[in-house]
Amino acid sequence: MKIDFLTLFPEMFQGVLHSSILKQAQERGAVSFRVVNFREYSENKHKKVDDYPYGGGAGMVLSPQPLFDAVEDLTKKSSSTPRVILMCPQGETFTQRKAEELAQAEHLILLCGHYEGYDERIRSYLVTDELSIGDYVLTGGELGAMVIADSVTRLLPAVLGNETSAQTDSFSTGLLEYPQYTRPADFRGWKVPDVLLSGHHQNIERWRKEQSLKRTLERRPDLLEGRKLTEEEQELLDSIRKQQEK
């Protein structure tokens, strides 16, 4: 996979792309990153990339020309049609399901804006997706783009080294992850649940399902709305609700 970032602040990406999972993914050849300062594509003699909004108003608006030229140049060098993603608080909320969808693409181009906003023609004629990482406003799109790149990259084959890790993460199953424990079995009097020490894999699996459902019900009940539960999951959920009513 190729992931390109179009930004006015390329230095923001240095630490993120050269650390942890993203660094390992590049070393394993699973992904390549490219950070491009789209100011370099500006035809303005002063390399301006923004201008005042027509009709008046506060702030500056990103001009279409530099971003169109940058995307078109990156697309020329691509063997497949890229997903061009605009980081924007008005966009679709980014979810694990969206990450899984994007992980199937060969090439992503993430547009990171600053200033008041984008010329509407960028939205209408250049991008394929508009994404937001939450209902709040950031100074620019760079942090959101980093979040998306991390979330997508860890889903690529061989990146985590243990495929089960990605499959059992919170949200990957549509539920929050069950509690995890490691040694020691007793820390300051706080003990690991006996079932996890039993070696009985069937009981452990059932406990994990129950805890995952319980945690989801308590913290993110919206994830259960409209979810098609298995017979075992429904039985466990009914039991959890009865216990909570006592």
Swiss-Prot record:
<keyword id="KW-0819">tRNA processing</keyword>
<feature type="binding site">
    <location>
        <begin position="133"/>
        <end position="138"/>
    </location>
    <ligand>
        <name>S-adenosyl-L-methionine</name>
    </ligand>
</feature>
<dbReference type="InterPro" id="IPR016009">
    <property type="entry name" value="tRNA_MeTrfase_TRMD/TRM10"/>
</dbReference>
<dbReference type="InterPro" id="IPR002649">
    <property type="entry name" value="tRNA_m1G_MeTrfase_TrmD"/>
</dbReference>
<keyword id="KW-0489">Methyltransferase</keyword>
<comment type="function">
    <text>Specifically methylates guanosine-37 in various tRNAs.</text>
</comment>
<feature type="binding site">
    <location>
        <position position="113"/>
    </location>
    <ligand>
        <name>S-adenosyl-L-methionine</name>
    </ligand>
</feature>
<keyword id="KW-0949">S-adenosyl-L-methionine</keyword>
<dbReference type="InterPro" id="IPR029026">
    <property type="entry name" value="tRNA_m1G_MTases_N"/>
</dbReference>
<dbReference type="GO" id="GO:0005829">
    <property type="term" value="C:cytosol"/>
</dbReference>
<comment type="subunit">
    <text>Homodimer.</text>
</comment>
<dbReference type="InterPro" id="IPR029028">
    <property type="entry name" value="Alpha/beta_knot_MTases"/>
</dbReference>
<dbReference type="GO" id="GO:0002939">
    <property type="term" value="P:tRNA N1-guanine methylation"/>
</dbReference>
<comment type="similarity">
    <text>Belongs to the RNA methyltransferase TrmD family.</text>
</comment>
<keyword id="KW-0808">Transferase</keyword>
<dbReference type="Pfam" id="PF01746">
    <property type="entry name" value="tRNA_m1G_MT"/>
</dbReference>
<dbReference type="GO" id="GO:0052906">
    <property type="term" value="F:tRNA (guanine(37)-N1)-methyltransferase activity"/>
</dbReference>
<protein>
    <recommendedName>
        <fullName>tRNA (guanine-N(1)-)-methyltransferase</fullName>
        <ecNumber>2.1.1.228</ecNumber>
    </recommendedName>
</protein>
<dbReference type="InterPro" id="IPR023148">
    <property type="entry name" value="tRNA_m1G_MeTrfase_C_sf"/>
</dbReference>
<keyword id="KW-0963">Cytoplasm</keyword>
